[in-house]
């Protein structure tokens, strides 16, 4: 497996020490414009990007960037620049979760789909208890000119690879390995014992088409079978964690594209766009491996970092406002992180 500690420290060594903070060994906060800061990150070194950029449509003056653009197109152009950098720094088997408003959802997806396969659009509902449901109960319904936006969106995506939604980095690699050692999909299926119910290529053809992924045990069988035929040592086989996009859910998690998490209740020093830890943990647990590197390019008060630490991941947080950088540092220094893995 890739030496994540080495990769993590190598990434951090590229940042100016005057703007880099390490409140914990596996949590780093970098102050500055994340669009510029990302240029210092080596290509294909981040496992998961979980981030909450300005929504633009909400037009809140207390959120940096929310009132920056007068035209929608200018905001979308700006976000497209982020998408280009996200794709460059993300591992081939990495994933992204990007928060957005329901009003800008489709326009953003149109831009993101140039570089990413859109795997899901998650609707985050907010089943808050009475008294903690914001303006939903208090507002005058007769003044509404559209349906009240009681939910938010999270676009879940992975780097585009090929011309089809299901094409994957692993599928393309498996096909190229087979061609190098001259073994058919049918023969490899027989050797691994992974028979398909429909097509004659069995599971191998499904894996190459991106309709399914092998288990860890199946991947080991694939590699062993290919190594026997790779007599000239032409192929360098990556570990499972470095080629298979993680997606790990179970019955204890929210596993549909509707997520029900209460919002963060008001407290002194709360970030105006703060997201709940349990929601962030749901995404991190599903789409990363233990010890992976999680990046948040709009980190606010450091919630993503706290969630990542609780699950045994490393985090890099980027924040442009000094006020929130200091709040994040204080938060991560003082918070007793309880590992949940």
Briefly describe each language-model feature range.
Residues 1-10, 14-318, 323-325:
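Core catalytic lobe of class I
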Residues 76, 333-339:
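Conserved phosphoryl-transfer catalytic core
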